[in-house]
């Protein structure tokens, strides 16, 4: 059998993964080495391309994520050769990867950008949906059109967006924290956003622009071949645009929040009936909860002893790095979160193998105002920087750490508000000797600044505050701001004039 295998193809540079990190890395390498073939190995027939990139400030950036067929990438970069197949095995000692189609690809430098997989609260249950990529988002839309009630488990960015976007369907949202959006916000910011959630949504929404899906041309057989339910790359910003997230009922928002609880058990209808369990109706306006007489396809028992029936469950409980295909026979150093450990040049513990994006775990001495979060902005930055490091190593040059790792900076949208997160925006790891300064105009803006020893360490800006560039500079230059006191957030003082 071995003799029938096609001869290995060789590429000086091989990149695995068609998400933002992998495509950015491949594009950067293709630009740097126009006469070299860059191999991009991806299990999916579509790739994620960064378009309309805008540098808002030194570090803050905005871009669109466009989902395209891999042929479009080849048109832009003729020296990128896309291999549409999953990875079966990595033979690091032989500098070779074996793809699912049985082919071998020899590399001189390899970058692993295979992303992460959703942590499902329950594997193999047809009523539990994990939303991670476009295919699962479209499956969710299909299920929602028939749904009267759904349950969302989790408190990350996708859960936040879903809860705001879903209409015409009862939503029970279970989170293990005291407040929503714990990864991104403290209780104050959560309260600010929750008031927006409870208010009825107007039909006219601000037009989003970041994600466009151009996937109509993709082949059906290619989709099934890619096993997209397992390996899809992460959704970009505004992933729900173009999806009509409406249930069967004629109302806008009906959300019930269950805090400080997790899923204890999931029952299918037959099991629920046999066990003679009792479930609650959807809680309404502080009325006492009553037993639900309606039968549902699936039931969720929470750790607070409440049981609710629903049409299906959305598992939005985070991700785990997708390292599985690469571990067998290779002694990678792994981080506590299961990611491939990378040094300050995005190099893993194995020779000539780099990693970027959700699959990796940073293990260098981090800047005091930067932290790794598995977000699309960091995927782009890491993919870009990994390519620079691979290029420098192959030509024997040295390279400085990229400036984007000096300060954590992320801009996004939640509940139709612009949200900017800077530095240690939630006082992550700062100990108890920090203080917070707040300014809040209900329905318009929420500003929180994290101070330590008179210096700004982080900030959360919700709404159109126009303070991001000033605050970015203040965090970066670590100027002592003690003398300004509360004036820093005084709306009557133009703070930018102070620090021009």
From Swiss-Prot:
Stretches for region Disordered: 211-235
Effect of residue 155 to S: In MFM8; also found in a patient with limb-girdle muscular dystrophy; decreased function in cellular response to oxidative stress; no effect on subcellular location in the nucleus and sarcomere
Major site of localization recorded for this protein: nucleus
Similarity comment text for this entry: Belongs to the class-I pyridine nucleotide-disulfide oxidoreductase family. PYROXD1 subfamily.
GO molecular function term, any single one: NAD(P)H oxidase H2O2-forming activity
Name of the featured protein: Pyridine nucleotide-disulfide oxidoreductase domain-containing protein 1
Cross-referenced Pfam families: Pyr_redox_2, Rubredoxin_C
Sequence ranges of Basic and acidic residues compositional bias: 213-228
Lineage per the UniProt record: Eukaryota, Metazoa, Chordata, Craniata, Vertebrata
Co-factor note (free text): Binds 1 FAD per subunit.
Gene designation per UniProt: PYROXD1
InterPro entries membership: FAD-bd_OxRdtase, FAD/NAD-bd_sf, FAD/NAD-binding_dom, FAD/NAD-linked_Rdtase_dimer_sf, Rubredoxin_C
The keyword Methyltransferase belongs to this UniProt entry's keyword annotation: no
Cofactor(s) the protein requires to work: FAD
Annotated localization: Nucleus; Cytoplasm; Cytoplasm, Myofibril, Sarcomere
EC top class named in words: oxidoreductase
Gene Ontology process terms (BP): cellular response to oxidative stress
Disease: Myopathy, myofibrillar, 8: A form of myofibrillar myopathy, a group of chronic neuromuscular disorders characterized at ultrastructural level by disintegration of the sarcomeric Z disk and myofibrils, and replacement of the normal myofibrillar markings by small dense granules, or larger hyaline masses, or amorphous material. MFM8 is an autosomal recessive form, clinically characterized by slowly progressive symmetrical weakness affecting both proximal and distal muscles, with normal to moderately elevated creatine kinase. A mutation in PYROXD1 is the cause of autosomal recessive limb-girdle muscular dystrophy. The affected individual with a homozygous recessive PYROXD1 mutation showed progressive muscle weakness with an onset at the age of 9 years. Initial symptoms included excessive falling while running, with slowly progressive weakness. Difficulty navigating stairs by the age if 18, and loss of ambulation at the age of 37 years. Neurological examination showed proximal symmetrical muscle weakness and wasting, along with calf muscle pseudohypertrophy.
Post-translational modification N-acetylmethionine, affected residues: 1
Enzyme Commission number: 1.8.1.-
Superkingdom, taxonomy of origin: Eukaryota
Oxidoreductase among keywords: yes
Organism: Homo sapiens
Keywords assigned: Acetylation, Cytoplasm, Disease variant, FAD, Flavoprotein, Limb-girdle muscular dystrophy, Myofibrillar myopathy, NADP, Nucleus, Oxidoreductase
Function: Probable FAD-dependent oxidoreductase; involved in the cellular oxidative stress response. Required for normal sarcomere structure and muscle fiber integrity.
């Amino acid at each position: 059998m071995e003799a029938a295998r096609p001869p290995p193809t060789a590429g000086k540079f091989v990149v695995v993964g068609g998400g933002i990190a992998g495509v950015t890395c491949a594009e950067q390498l293709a630009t740097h080495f126009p006469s070299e073939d860059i191999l991009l190995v991806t299990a999916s027939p579509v790739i994620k391309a960064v378009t309309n990139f805008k540098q808002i400030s030194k570090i803050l950036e905005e871009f669109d994520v466009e989902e395209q067929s891999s042929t479009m990438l080849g048109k832009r970069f003729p020296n990128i050769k896309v291999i549409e197949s999953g990875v079966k095995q990595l033979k690091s000692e032989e500098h070779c990867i074996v793809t699912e189609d049985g082919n071998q690809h020899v590399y001189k430098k390899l970058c692993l950008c295979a992303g992460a997989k959703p942590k499902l609260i329950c594997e193999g249950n047809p009523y539990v949906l994990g939303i991670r990529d476009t295919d699962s988002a479209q499956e969710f839309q299909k299920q929602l059109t028939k749904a009267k009630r759904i349950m969302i488990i989790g408190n990350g960015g996708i859960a936040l967006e879903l809860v705001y976007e879903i209409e015409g369907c009862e939503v029970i949202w279970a989170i293990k924290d005291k407040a929503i959006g714990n990864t991104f916000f403290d209780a104050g910011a959560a309260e600010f956003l929750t008031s927006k959630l409870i208010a009825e949504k107007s039909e006219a929404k601000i037009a989003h622009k970041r994600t466009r899906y151009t996937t109509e041309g993709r082949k059906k057989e290619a989709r099934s071949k890619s096993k997209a339910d397992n390996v899809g790359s992460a959704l970009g910003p505004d992933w729900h645009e173009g999806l009509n997230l409406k249930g069967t009922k004629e109302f806008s928002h009906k959300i019930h929040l269950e805090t400080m609880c997790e899923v204890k058990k999931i029952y299918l209808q037959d099991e629920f009936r046999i066990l003679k369990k009792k479930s609650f109706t959807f809680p309404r306006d502080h009325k006492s909860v009553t037993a639900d007489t309606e039968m549902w396809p699936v039931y969720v028992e929470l750790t607070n002893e409440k049981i609710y029936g629903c049409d299906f469950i959305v598992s939005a409980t985070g991700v785990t790095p997708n390292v599985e295909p690469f571990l067998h026979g290779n002694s990678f150093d792994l981080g506590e979160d299961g990611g491939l450990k990378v040094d300050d040049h995005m190099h893993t513990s194995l020779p000539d193998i780099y990693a970027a994006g959700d699959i990796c775990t940073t293990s260098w001495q981090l800047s005091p105002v930067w932290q790794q979060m598995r977000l699309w902005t960091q995927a782009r930055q890491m993919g870009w920087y990994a390519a620079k490091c691979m290029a420098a190593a192959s030509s024997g040059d040295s390279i400085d750490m990229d400036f984007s790792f000096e300060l954590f900076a992320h801009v996004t949208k939640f509940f139709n508000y612009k949200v900017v997160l800077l530095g240690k925006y939630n006082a992550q790891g700062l100990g108890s000797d920090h203080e917070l300064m707040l300014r809040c105009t209900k329905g318009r803006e929420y500003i929180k600044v994290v101070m330590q020893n008179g210096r700004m360490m982080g900030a959360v800006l919700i709404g159109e505050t126009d303070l991001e560039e000033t605050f970015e500079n203040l965090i970066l230059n670590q100027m002592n701001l003690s003398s300004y006191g509360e004036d820093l957030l005084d709306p009557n003082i133009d703070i930018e004039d102070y620090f021009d």
